């Protein structure tokens, strides 16, 4: 089986490929124009992007959108996590949290696939908290500052093998993989 993931992020492509490998699903990168949908819900963003890209590129197009919701910041950056990361980076986010006792955060990923004009969305969520400083060398994006609930290590410290089993993206894409496998869509 093969799906096409709309991303320009090589780390995300590798991560999704690793997550879907047990389902015997190959992931190739779809070189598509970036779809900018402004909404405060990653599910809506992923759904609309999948609809648009499916109309342009056909079936088995997959889009994911991720948000990081930090309690002390009223849910900021939410679905604007990528933009915030590019503009102020981890140091900027940590500066916003200076003096904050409540460092709880939730990572949410919505993975949407379009087949026959119909979009299915799968959501993965991980609760945790924001570290006081970046830790670890693995992963990408917010991985050095996000500590999943019940753990003491950041995603970056956990290593790829562990992260790809417990992350918000792993939860969303594992659901997508199971859904595709159960429907025998590739036979």
From Swiss-Prot:
Enzyme class, UniProt record, top EC level: hydrolase
Q: Which residues does the entry assign to the active site, renumbered to this chain? A: 65 (proton acceptor)
The residues listed in the UniProt record as binding substrate, with positions renumbered to this chain, are 7-12, 66, 140-143, 163, 168-169
Q: Where does Mg(2+) bind?
A: 36, 65
EC numbers listed for it are 3.6.1.66
Q: Which domain of life is it from?
A: Archaea
The UniProt record lists the keyword Metal-binding? yes
Keyword Magnesium attributed: yes
> Can you list the GO cellular component terms from the UniProt entry?
cytoplasm
InterPro entries attached here? Answer: dITP/XTP_pyrophosphatase, ITPase-like_fam, RdgB/HAM1
Q: GO biological process annotations for this chain's record?
A: nucleoside triphosphate catabolic process; nucleotide metabolic process; purine nucleoside triphosphate catabolic process
Q: Where are the transmembrane segments?
A: none
Cite the Pfam families for this sequence.
Answer: Ham1p_like
What keywords does the record list, in alphabetical order? Hydrolase, Magnesium, Metal-binding, Nucleotide metabolism, Nucleotide-binding
Q: Which GO terms describe its molecular function?
A: dITP diphosphatase activity; ITP diphosphatase activity; metal ion binding; nucleoside triphosphate diphosphatase activity; nucleotide binding; ribonucleoside triphosphate phosphatase activity; XTP diphosphatase activity
The record describes how the cofactor is bound as: Binds 1 Mg(2+) ion per subunit.
Q: Write down the chemical reaction(s) this protein catalyses.
A: XTP + H2O = XMP + diphosphate + H(+); dITP + H2O = dIMP + diphosphate + H(+); ITP + H2O = IMP + diphosphate + H(+)
Q: Required cofactors, per record?
A: Mg(2+)
Q: Which PANTHER family does the UniProt record give?
A: INOSINE TRIPHOSPHATE PYROPHOSPHATASE (PTHR11067:SF9), INOSINE TRIPHOSPHATE PYROPHOSPHATASE/HAM1 PROTEIN (PTHR11067)
Family the entry assigns: Belongs to the HAM1 NTPase family.
Fill in the subunit field for this protein: Homodimer.
Describe the function of this protein.
Pyrophosphatase that catalyzes the hydrolysis of nucleoside triphosphates to their monophosphate derivatives, with a high preference for the non-canonical purine nucleotides XTP (xanthosine triphosphate), dITP (deoxyinosine triphosphate) and ITP. Seems to function as a house-cleaning enzyme that removes non-canonical purine nucleotides from the nucleotide pool, thus preventing their incorporation into DNA/RNA and avoiding chromosomal lesions.
Name by which UniProt lists this protein: dITP/XTP pyrophosphatase
Q: Which organism is it from?
A: Pyrobaculum aerophilum (strain ATCC 51768 / DSM 7523 / JCM 9630 / CIP 104966 / NBRC 100827 / IM2)
